Amino acid sequence: MPVSSIIRQWNYIEKITACDATGHQHYQDFNDVRSLFYNGVEWTTGYPAATGIGTQWGGIMIDVDALLCKDGSVRVLGVDNPLQIAAHAYSQNVLLGEKDAALPQKTTPKFERAKAVWKEDHGFVYVSGTAAIRGEQSLEGVGIEQQTLTTLENIEYLVSRDNLNRSGIPAMENATLITFRVYVKRWEDMEKAKQVVTERYPDLPAIYTLTDVCRSELLIEIEGMGILC
C-alpha cells in the first residue's frame, strides 16, 4: 500500500521534549525526518490524523491505520479546526530546539486535526491528539482542570456539524464521540483530569495513561474516535 494510504498514525517518541547535547529536541528531530519522508508523497486528502506522545524508553515506535479503496466509494478528508492553527502551518516560534543543518528551517508536525472517512451517509472520524492550544499557543498557567476543559472544547468544535460541513464532509449532525484515550503528564493530575472528562462524558469509554506530551507546558492530550451520520 502507498504511504499516502495512511489515514491515522501514532508516534511514540522516547523522552519527547528532551534535547540532546547539541540542543536538538527529540520531537523536532522526529518532525524533521517525518517531513522529509512525507515530501515524496502527494497527500491529496490531507496528512494523516496523528498523535505524537512521549515514552520513557524505546526510541521511536510508529503504528498506523491505512485505507486503500480502489473503486472510490469511500471518501477521506482531513479536518481543520478554526480554533487552532493547523499543525503543519505552525510558525517557527513554537518549534523548539536547534535547526538541522541539512534543512533551511525547522519543519512543522505533518498531521491533520482529524481525518474523516465515510461512504454515502455514514462513516467515522479519527480525532488526532488534541491539547489546550488556541491558535498555535499553549494555554499556560491555568492548571489541569482548565487545560482538560479547553482540550474537550477543541475536540467538540472539531467534530461539530458546522465544522465538518465547512471541511466538505456531509454530516447531518455533530459526530458522536465513542471513545477517548487520555494522556496525562503528571500523576497528581490524573484524578482531576478524570473528573473533568467524566462530568462532561459520563458514559464514554476512556483509557487514561501517564505519559509525557509534546510540549513541556501542556499537562494533557486527548485523542478519540467519532461516528458520522
Regions found by a protein language model. Give the residues of each.
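N-terminal presequence-like segments and the immediate start of the first folded domain
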Residues: M1-I13, T17-E153, Y157, R161-C229
